[in-house]
């Protein structure tokens, strides 16, 4: 009679698990659709009646256990009975009653299921060297024979024919001509008492009657010949004994599979080969109600279900997860039951599948437990071996687990939370079980109408995504209905959607793609973006065109989140479908003015608050600006961040938004300058300390410089280059340059003016002190050295500049140094102009200029050389160089200048003289051969001249002993040939100086008045042959010297010498040179 255990009710579980709906989510109407009906999971608990039947079956199995235990099994029956009592939750009194009742039941028929597999290495009894083996086997019931007695030993050597009745003897087939026969035949051998029963197997060689001629034809060796003689002595048709196997049943395990040696009856041939035997103790006619009414595999399935349920429950009670391994007690009981019921491996696997697949739907344990029975069923699947009822039960288990698995997949976000570390592996294991199940031949034959698994999973994921979205929407539903509250709720919902998509992309998509090739992320994004788009669009319409600041802030956060959501989506392609969020920025257009005004208002408040809190104290030794500059930098960075967040897609509107951002930023910069100066005045008025006022002014200038650096980075922070590329096709050429860059340059110009004004104020405080110290240099006593005279000035600058360097950033300090340097040069020029006649004062000013240059350069830390060496500096340096020189030094410089002029002159428009000059060091004689002059100017009225040449060694103070020399005068000659030689007795040392020269003055002799000047030529003595080397000079080379005139506008050196009225030598030199200049001016060509 069938019970609830044997006929599980079948239901359309797939339809309950998931409804296939093809329409898109965009067609969903609010309110959200009703959730799909949950899968009805069949309970794994049994009714009391079913439990009693199963408990009886388990007790019966333990009580009628046969054979030795397996190595890892429990040996004691009491331990197994206690385990069953705990597993079935039976009270002690009830357990004892059930135990007594089971013991009173009729014992089963004990059977030994023996399988003769094969033999190897048996004796060859035939003439051919082979045998025709067969086996006789049975069970001998021994009564009253002591173990180890002589009778027992004799009986073990006895053959089956003599010990077991013929009706209880079983025989295998005969295998012809082989020494390694294979039978694989199974026999069921009944016995009553395992303690006195033994298994006997005899192996025989079948002997058939053959003629001597036939045997001689099969003869192969001498051993075969001996076999012929031996057989001739025995009876015709008598089989040969090959060996036997005798085993006590009580020594066998419940299942045995071994090779046993074939024993001889005599010691003639001790090695007779081996026989492969399999044994299994089974029951017939079990007296339990379950065994009489239900299929064996069904009872085993229910027993397995009960024990596994107990194992899982025990682990959960101990706060540990079950690792899919059964306890030794459970393994022993299940092994005994399957063996006693003679369940095949296939039916055991099927029972395991039915039990585990049902328990998985109600208990928590690894889904990997299902893989082993799936693999076993697939490996052993033969459809014909199952009855219709079994096929239906297996098909129901497939559809039930599939429906349950799809329901878990639909709710995977809550069933497999990422807060639990093993959730991804558990989901992956479930998917692999479903994949393996749907790939089975059994599944394909029993569930032919099932849709492909990937399609079912995709639809489950799609519906699960929609259900999750509506659940989140309900979770964020505001308590108070209002546009602001609705916006906050929608923002939270969008952020949850993004978080879910991030999880899908990082974790879940990899699992679904690897197992089923399903792109979960793309599917979830497409579904969720339609749902989000409809709600956002409705919300922006409800917000209207006039957006308040609070609502505008909420809309901006929502816009930024949607922008991030769109960027999170799959990579766009040309063939992708239109998304609901495409062009979503247009929904927020009315809110743009509110966003821009909010950004400026917040920034302005921050600037005002930062200035008000600023005490104008540097932040540290390396940071010379104050707190408001840092706050301002953060404020402008926030504006740039807001602009990047906005990143408006429309190019033309994006350009206008950027213009507004730049305009507001520049306006805030100028506002800050006004506020920080006012703050400085406010604090200075309170403290009334000039030094602290200077400190604060330094901080103000530094803050402005820091602000200038921030403003200068606007093109990078607001990505002007990218904007220019985007608006290139929309704006006119140069419009961006004329607009944005004009705004930026205007702001930078305003900041530069403010900085220069502040630095100028600081410079003015120092300029007075610098001018005072420079003026004091003039009044210092003559006995004081110039280096000592400038010490007060240098100490003043060292203190002040060190202070400024400490309190100003490098850019402002450099600007201050530039202003001070310019002012210092101006003061030095004025003082130097008033002291031209005093070489002492000029010397001090010269030393001061040199030290000031070093001071302002500061070993590279101050102004660079190109900033120091201005035109004013160069001119002043030259003037002071001359003014500080003595009269003789000035004369020397004059001749150096004329020598340089002579070297640079190539034109012979005044004529030229040709000379040979050499120096004989041994005699200290300078030899001058004046050869000729040519192309002289006609200075007489007759168109000719009366030239002669005056030779002098200059300067005179270097050659005081040497008198001038003259050549003869040539009448009316413009190309005179003098050919005269002059020798000057002079030492070599003065001749080697750079300013020492031979002055050749060509004059036109005038009898009535002063001689006229034809021109001058300056020959440097340091280049004369023989002057520098010790060897006597050879033939001196000719030198052609163009004639020159003195400078027409006067020479500054002469003017300086002229100002020294009390120096007679200077006045005499100036008088001579003025005379020459006057003569030159009268006849200049």
UniProtKB/Swiss-Prot annotation:
Residue numbers binding Ca(2+) 3: 939-940, 1004, 1006, 1012
InterPro entries linked to this entry: C2_dom, C2_domain_sf, MUN_dom, Munc13_1, Munc13_dom-2, UNC-13_domain
Gene Ontology BP, a term: positive regulation of substrate adhesion-dependent cell spreading
Tissue and organ expression note: Mast cells.
Residues the entry annotates as binding Ca(2+) 1: 126, 132, 205, 207
Subcellular location: Cytoplasm; Membrane; Late endosome; Recycling endosome
Domain called C2: residue spans: 91-238, 909-1034
Cofactor(s) recorded in Swiss-Prot or TrEMBL: Ca(2+)
Domain called MHD2: residue spans: 785-892
Annotated region described as Disordered, given as residue ranges: 24-46
Family annotation (SMART domains): C2
Residues where Phosphoserine is found: 149
Binding residues annotated for Ca(2+) 2, in chain numbering: 940, 946, 1004, 1006
Cellular component GO terms, alphabetical: cytosol; exocytic vesicle; late endosome; lysosome; membrane; recycling endosome; Weibel-Palade body
Chain spans, region Interaction with RAB27A: 239-542
UniProt-listed SUPFAM superfamilies: C2 domain (Calcium/lipid-binding domain, CaLB)
Top-level lineage group: Eukaryota
Keyword Transmembrane: no
Domain characteristics, as noted in the entry: The MHD1 and MHD2 domains mediate localization on recycling endosomes and lysosome.
Entry's family note: Belongs to the unc-13 family.
Job description of the protein: Plays a role in cytotoxic granule exocytosis in lymphocytes. Required for both granule maturation and granule docking and priming at the immunologic synapse. Regulates assembly of recycling and late endosomal structures, leading to the formation of an endosomal exocytic compartment that fuses with perforin-containing granules at the immunologic synapse and licences them for exocytosis. Regulates Ca(2+)-dependent secretory lysosome exocytosis in mast cells.
PANTHER family given in the database record: PROTEIN UNC-13 HOMOLOG D (PTHR45999:SF3), UNC-13-4A, ISOFORM B (PTHR45999)
The name this protein goes by in its record: Protein unc-13 homolog D
Gene name of the record: Unc13d
